[in-house]
Amino acid sequence: MNTLKAQRRETTEKAKKLRREGYVTGNLFGRQIEGSILLKIEKKEAERIMRECMKGSQIMLEVEGKEYDVLIKEMDYDAMTRSILEMDFQELVKGEKVHSVAEIILHNKDKVIEGALEQLLEEVAYKATPEHLVDKIDVDCSTLHLGDTITVGDLAIAKNKDVDVVTHLDSVVVTVLTPNNADIPSDEDAEETAAE
């Protein structure tokens, strides 16, 4: 399991100032934590963990020597630079279900040769205990043809008895559509070309 190191942040330390100094701010909360713990994380450390993890990933958070089994609950990015600004973590309790999301990753998109592949859903919301958390869902697009659709109900996560899927099972994840109508000459266009 990936480990992220963080430090406690004093309430007097302003987020903007910390970000200028190379930190990402954060919060740790959970049923067994009174209030929440304000955090500061070295930006390089946050970027390292984000290369391997995502929203919904389970990691070990080390705060000044104490380790917490946590879920990456939220991440805020700078709209212009897309650099990470803030991360929120929820402490996990063994045997207790937690709300989370699993990111949908499409594979073999280039194998879809007829039609245009359109992804309509980026993540699936679900509830599970810490030992059954899912941070990503891999979807193979290599066998999709024009008119094919994959719904949440078709995904492995929907068939996992240890996971309660919250997103509607009939929600469309990906579909293969007819290519843009502008690229296909209509009968009227053909008639106009012939008349010229």
Residue ranges: model-predicted function:
Residues 1-196:
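Acidic, negatively charged sequence tracts
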